[in-house]
Amino acid sequence: WDKALEKYEQILYIPMSSALSGAYSTARCLADEEEYKDKVFVVDAGSVSTPMHRLILDAIELINEGYSAKEILSIIEESREKMIIYIGLDTLENLKRGGRISGSSALIGNVLNIKPVMKFSTGLLDIHKKCRGISQCYQSRNF
């Protein structure tokens, strides 16, 4: 941050969701140090992929409009709460490996051809809906 602060007055750092990485916590601790007070602002993206990219594009637009990093932080945190990703999974294998479901649940789900729709919202990943077959997931657009 020291090199960036030689060129810029303020830094706005947007790491991926704190639920998925320790980058936010580390950056938050560093930003709280006296030398970075009111100079470095850290936003928990609460997501990854497209919603995180959208937050970054919004931040760039706000910078170009002349907003301060502190103002952008507030705006980004508010809009972050409205972003949701839905993902239809074709296999239960990764949920089993990640400990989200048991081996027996994965076995039964596979036998019944259950395909979960996952909801990723502000750092939380949950099973939103269960479908019978992947085509039902694709047809089910009213999440």
Predicted regions and their residues:
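Mixed-charge interfacial surface used for oligomerization/domain docking
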Residues: Q10, A19-F41, S47-L57, E61-F143
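Glycine-rich phosphate-binding loop signature in dinucleotide/nucleotide-binding domains
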Residues: A4-Q10
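Glycine/small-residue-rich loop that forms an oxyanion/phosphate-binding "nest" at active or ligand-binding sites
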Residues: Y13
